Regions:
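N-terminal pre-triad scaffold of radical SAM enzymes
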Residues: 42-46, 64, 253-276, 303, ...
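Iron-sulfur (Fe-S) cluster-binding segments and ferredoxin-like electron-carrier domains
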Residues: 278-294
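Short hydrophobic segments within beta-strands
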Residues: 43-45, 75, 111, 147, ...
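Conserved SAM/AdoMet-binding glycine-rich loop
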Residues: 43, 116, 301-359
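Helix-enriched interaction subdomains in cytosolic or periplasmic regions
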Residues: 1-18, 67
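Glycine-rich beta-alpha loop elements in corrinoid/cobalamin-binding modules
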Residues: 77-225
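Low-complexity, highly charged intrinsically disordered N-terminal segments
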Residues: 40-45, 49-86, 90, 102-104
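N-terminal [4Fe-4S]-dependent radical SAM core
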Residues: 12-41, 48-49, 208, 214-264
Length: 359
């Protein structure tokens, strides 16, 4: 492994908020990159302040590092001041945990929470020295993956991403690790085409290069799989029981002030409301609640580990959680499951579901 830290450190006294690029936060992991393990770089394509609190990245970070056949690190887009210095000195995009060059990972996975980060993805790839267009990548280049809500319309990024994860990622990353690991151990038999074909067989994974598109002028006439075993329609991946995935177990505590600077506990996923303006409420169905006792435990243990004095009970409509009253009162009233005097944040709270008890 090539450590970039000796080349990065001299640049940090010339940039704003150098702690963005140090790593080693409470909750961070320093994985061992064994030759037989699949190395993942999980990238939130925005600055550290915006990306670090992202629950999706933290969940996959823990899940992958619990596996014997995987090693996962984090990456965040550098601010323009450091980017200019990196380009001037030929310092590539790097991971935060060990400052390993991004191009040395087996997989670079981007979390696309919204369409406005698309250009940041391309910039990170360019900084990494990885060909921006998928068709130009060689066998030794990382597999470029994207997941998150924005991937439900993957086509704007289809020329740049090798594989999209549609839906929940908790199970998919394990399936992908097994496929990529088997390909590595085989000596990369069949080249990049072979591993992308095998990835396309995983439920919830869309590989654009496995499909041929026929046009009628500017309109699409037909989309055909290139192989008979590749699915014609990619179904989203959904975890059935949120209680089986009590993550993140060890939330990261940032080195500088970040957005959503508090403990975050997801109490349910999905939504029953069906608001027509809300993409997330449609694509994350069905509703899956976290068991009340598990939510209590995650709040109590999370507050003790992080030292936060505020917890956000996150969901698309937190007041619709069936045990919301008991959960909030347990935190505020200092019952056995609570952790003293802490504030409770209820994001996405609907007025028609707000009660005096919650207040």
């Amino acid at each position: 492994m090539t450590a970039l830290w000796p080349r990065i450190e001299p640049l940090l006294d010339r940039v704003e908020k150098p702690a963005r690029y140090i790593g080693m936060e409470r909750g961070a992991q320093v994985p061992i990159h064994r030759p037989d393990a699949v190395s993942w770089l999980l990238v939130y394509p925005d600055t550290y302040e915006v990306g670090l609190p992202n629950q999706g990245l933290q969940i996959l970070y823990e899940i992958l590092n619990e596996r014997d056949d995987a090693a996962a690190e984090r990456g965040y887009a550098p601010w323009t001041d450091l980017e200019a210095l990196m380009r001037a000195r030929s310092v590539p995009f790097f991971s935060l945990d060990t400052h390993k060059p991004a191009g040395e990972f087996d997989v670079i996975a981007f979390g696309l929470a919204a369409e406005l980060v698309y250009t940041n993805v391309l910039n990170c790839l360019d900084l990494s020295g990885v060909p921006v267009r998928a068709e130009a990548r060689r066998d030794e280049d990382p597999i470029v993956v994207a997941g998150g809500h924005a991937t439900f319309n993957p086509e704007p990024m289809a020329d740049f991403i090798d594989a999209f994860v549609i839906g929940d990622g908790e199970e998919v990353v394990g399936d992908m690790t097994e496929v990529i690991g088997a390909w590595k151990r085989s000596g990369r038999v069949g080249g990049r085409e072979a591993v992308l074909h095998d990835l396309s067989l995983i439920m919830g994974v869309y590989v654009p290069s496995m499909y041929e598109v026929e046009y009628d002028g500017m309109a699409i006439r037909e989309v055909r799989p290139r192989y008979p075993d590749v699915p014609a329609t990619v179904d989203k991946r959904t975890i059935a029981d949120l209680g089986e995935w009590p993550y993140p177990k060890n939330q990261l505590v940032p080195l500088i002030e970040v957005v959503h600077d508090r403990l975050n506990v997801e109490i349910f996923r999905g939504c029953t409301r069906g608001c027509r303006f809300c993409q997330a409420g449609m694509i994350t169905r069905p509703v899956r609640e976290r068991p009340l006792e598990q939510a209590r435990t995650m709040v109590a243990e999370g507050l003790k580990r992080t030292g936060y004095d505020e917890v956000a009970l996150t969901s698309l409509s937190s007041a619709d959680f069936s045990g919301i009253g008991e959960l909030v009162s347990g935190i505020i009233d200092g019952q056995e499951e609570a952790c003293g005097n802490v504030g409770v944040s209820l994001p996405s709270l609907r007025v028609d579901a707000f009660t005096v008890g919650i207040a």
